Amino acid sequence: MPGGNTRSVLHVPPFPLTIVRGEGARIWDADGHEYLDFLGEYTAGLYGHSHPVIQAAIRQALADGTTLGAPNRYETQLAAAICGRFPSIELIRFCNSGTEANVMALSLARAATGREKLVVFEGGYHGGVLYFHHGGSPLNFPAPFVVGDYNDPAAAELVDRDTAAVLVEPMLGSGGVIPGDRAFLQALRDATRDHGALLIFDEVMTSRLAWGGLQDVLAITPDLTTLGKYLGGGLAFGAFGGRRDLMERFDPSRPDALPHAGTFNNAVLTMAAGAAGLTQVLTPAEIGRLNALGDHLRERIAALGVRATGYGSMVGLHDVEHVFFGMLERGYSYARRGFVALSLPLTEEDVDGFAKALAAELA
């Protein structure tokens, strides 16, 4: 592997920790050191490590066979659970990552509208080929993107009769955990409706912040929503869904059906783990409890004079990269850039311990 790496974000000079085991909110590295996990696998680890309910579901699915090459009983369970949570998702299709979900949603928008132009935002991250930090990436999905300023309502003026879709995170994740202003997001909703373009909310990270995602908190209904991360129960997962008239374009019984392939779109283990997590573990009350912990952590950090952004259980620490290794030595793991995503096993005592350790490092 080039540089010993197959996932760029995990590279931390001089070398990253190699984690060999996880249980609850704790992880252990190859040298036997123990850490409290405040990274939460960049929001994918919402359930913590080795949750017994999800483990049991995976074991049962594994015993029944995995590569069946056919529809399976778990995919309908997971589809029903997700559609039941998100009123804007009338129909859904599964894929293998948030990246894939966003590529498919954009491709659907272009096919449905017959237009090409796509509006995105500085700081937006929608996957490995949809990266819009500081001018974007040479590996980006080839399309005529127009990049606007996040949280600037005037960016809605970029939407015109040539626009197929606007793709936006209701809160920037990789771009600093910056909540979207409602006025900004509503302006995008109004502009897309006025010009016949589609509004796509990337809730790959943010769907965990409310039972109906941030779109429910904001009371703004997108045409399409993309999902990923924790919804696969800790296994590789992506999904996109939305308005029935749009998603029905993938109905294979139609003579004009749009193709959507993928060997592992309905991978048995992922479908089983995802369904178990959503129907047996995650509840609105648990989301609220974890969000309250995140709010508490932000308050504790802000009291130290550190800028702490985010919403609920997602927290962004700014300008504290210099204390990262010290925090590791104190037993706290999170992203070097300051990204924190809490998991369900964490407690108020754990959160207070993180804040105290940060205070000691900053002293």
Regions found by a protein language model. Name each.
Residues M1-A363:
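Conserved N-terminal phosphate-binding loop of PLP-dependent enzymes in the Aspartate aminotransferase
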